[in-house]
Structure formats: C-alpha cells, structure tokens
Amino acid sequence: YLWYGGGLKKDFSKASEIQKASSINFAKLLEMCALTQPKMRIRFSTSNPQDMSLDVIKIMAKYENICNYIHLPVQSGSNSVLKAMNRQHSREEYLELVKNIFKIIPDCSISHDMISGFPNESELDHKDTLSLMENVKYSFGYMFKYSERPGTPAAKKLEDNIDEKIKSRRLSEIVALQQKHSLFRSKEFIGKTVEVLIEKESKKSSLHWAGRNQQNTTVVFPKEGYSVGDFV
C-alpha cells in the first residue's frame, strides 16, 4: 500500500506524477506517526498477510511507542479453503510471516480471525486450522462459524453445505484451543513488569483501573491516585 492524496490506495499506477512523487509507503507513514507523537501509544489494524511487509515489522521494533501487537487474519489453516475463499496468502506464506514477526519482535502479540465450516471444508481442513493455531499460539482470536452473506462471491458460487452441528463442533474446538493459548501467552507475563495505559475503570470493581499493555493484554490494578490516560 502507498499513501497519497489523503487516502490509502492500491492502484498506484493510476496516480498522478505529483502523487507518485509525494507518496510514502505504510512503513514510512507509521514511522512519521511515531516520531511526531512520541508520547502517544500507536496501534494499527488490520494487517492483511499479503500487505504486511518486513519494513513495517522493523519499524514497529524500532519505536517503543508503536505497540507490539499485530492483528493478522488468517481465516483457515487449510490451503484448499484459503484458495476457495480467494485469500491472497497460503498457509506456508502465513507461517513464514509469523516466523519473521517473532524473529524481529520476540514479545509481539498476534491475534487472528478464524472461520469454521466454510463450504466444502473437510475434517482434514479443520485439523489444518488447529495445527496452524498450535504452531502460532495466538494471544487472542476472533472466531466465527460460516454463514452466507448475500451478494458475496462465496454465496454466489458455493453451497453452504456444512451441517450446523459440525460447524458448531469445529468452532468449539477452535475456541477451546484459543483459550488454552491465550492462557499460555498471559502466563508469559508472570514475574515481568510492563507499562500499562489506563483506559477506564474496571467493570468488576470501582476501586480498580483497567488498561492495556504493549501487547494489547488487559491489566486490572488498584487505582492508587492514577487517572485515565496515565502510563503506569
């Protein structure tokens, strides 16, 4: 992606010469934000795998005010399902990207989107999704079972042919595995001191604040004179 003319554009070939000369890529734009707002915590989303470059990852690692958190939708761990979804990445490309993220930002938190029961999804396809999750061990996830959306390519071309009970069972397995991995990632913070940006009063107690750390993990702690917007 290249930024020019006040918006994000994919078709750079149609840009004017002035727009081309003054354009910057997302990595540079992110760096400019980090430099001009050093006291502001910066988090961005969503990062489509095919658009997530090494340059962006390196900029994230370079500046402390850019959060070590990447939402990286995958949808499925099966190449056949990804192809049917018309996704622009393969399982192998996705895992290579994740490998590079952890290499450059070892404590990076990664979240995902996952769909169960896409048309023609087999048990093997489902197991491929579970194995990809085991490989990455995501910190968070947004998980859904497939339902037709009128007008979408999938609704026009593919029959919604997976039984609802199967969809629900597969989704339950995905959710259970994610809960296991979320606990694993949360336990990695035990014994560590992290910086938290206070966002609001805790829902569970008026005596506590709630905020998030660099990895987008929620932290709840006693108020002790702090205020919303403080870094603690």
Kindly give the residue locations of the regions a language model identified.
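Short, small-residue-rich loop/turn micro-motifs
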Residues: 1, 73-78, 145-150, 213-215
